[in-house]
Amino acid sequence: MTIQIKTTLTFDSWLSKLKNLRAKAKINARIKRLQFGNFGDIKSVNDGIFELRIDEGQGYRVYLKNQNGVLVILLCGGDKSTQDKDIKQAKLLAQELGL
């Protein structure tokens, strides 16, 4: 079973501006694995939002919402230093999208 992955403009903008090419490659590889149900290192941060942790450089994070196991929406991203702000942003984006 393949999971559909959708992104927000916020996530796309963050990923495109990421300068650490190795981190970007690892993030893209993790997104590919999400499509096949392999979520890896992930934890709940409340309100149905999950934090996908990427062990590279500054400790990158991707915030997502899983809809019934068939759709994953990548809300936003950041690193360990912006974690609290990113979680608030992910919650706000999820509300705006009606998730």
Curated annotation (Swiss-Prot):
Lineage per the UniProt record: Bacteria, Pseudomonadati, Pseudomonadota, Gammaproteobacteria, Pasteurellales
Superkingdom of origin: Bacteria
Name of the protein described by the UniProt record: Uncharacterized protein HI_1419
